[in-house]
Amino acid sequence: MATQNAILKKALIIFLFTLTIMTGTAFSQNCGTNGCKGNMCCSRWGYCGTTKAYCGTGCQSGPCNSKPKPTPTPSGSGGLNAGPRGTIASVITPAFFNSIMSKVGSGCPAKGFYTRQAFIAAAESFAAYKGTVAKREIAAMLAQFSHESGSFCYKEEIARGRYCSPSTTYPCQPGKNYYGRGPIQITWNYNYGAAGKFLGLPLLKDPDMVARSPTVAFQCAMWFWNKNVRPVLSQGFGATTRRINGGECNGGRPAAVQSRVNHYLDFCKKLGVTPGTNLSC
């Protein structure tokens, strides 16, 4: 009898151990819904782990691997804050600015809207540009603005949606839409609200101000640039693209990435500066 009880006890232990393993496996196979604990990846098959098999192709969540981000480049070499500098007015000469705007087609809605005077006035309203600025940064800024606005053809997004996200800080105003406007195509109520707060302008109540005033349009674009893009200038032009539209990077939209690079190379050439390194993302 004692022997039989021992056998039953051992069988029960084995059963419970097996059940525990099966339960754990069931949870790990459901990580696409429940996620993984700690710094683990949820694989394409629903398992949690930390190796390439989990964090590589098909990874659903967690610190999934992508192509490695560019290693920060020292500001003294390939960064956008390196190289020749000058005041905004001396860098944005009439000839340089006109060489960009002269390519805007006659049928473009923003033909004649973006002016050199507006760009300089907007830049000088930011402390970062009151002294001298790297020519590479100006080339990069204008390259990104040019790409986002269709080579300065547009001041408003073609597909004009509502773009209202619930917010107690920057609530959407009745009848107002927060679609892309200006050279960076600033979008969503929370961006209009934050930009307006920084600039001292009622952009939540009057988002169309960005499309009416070229100075405000450039100010909003520069607000976004200073807040989100300027911190990565030392990493090269590719890092600015990642900050503006990271979905294009790592093979997402190679043609769009190259378009941005082409604008940048063109403007660097016109300003007489080398482009630095890490151009793509």
Curated annotation (Swiss-Prot):
Cellular component GO terms held in the UniProt record: plasma membrane
Please report the name of this protein according to its UniProt entry.
Answer: Endochitinase At2g43610
- Boundaries of each Chitin-binding type-1 domain copy? 29-66
- GO molecular function, one example? endochitinase activity
Recorded catalytic reaction(s): these are:
Random endo-hydrolysis of N-acetyl-beta-D-glucosaminide (1->4)-beta-linkages in chitin and chitodextrins
Question: Any signal peptide, and if so, which residues?
Answer: 1-28
- Class in the EC hierarchy, top level: hydrolase
Q: Which GO terms describe its biological process?
A: cell wall macromolecule catabolic process; chitin catabolic process; defense response; polysaccharide catabolic process
Origin species = Arabidopsis thaliana
Source organism phylogeny: Eukaryota, Viridiplantae, Streptophyta, Embryophyta, Tracheophyta
Tell me the superkingdom of the source: Eukaryota
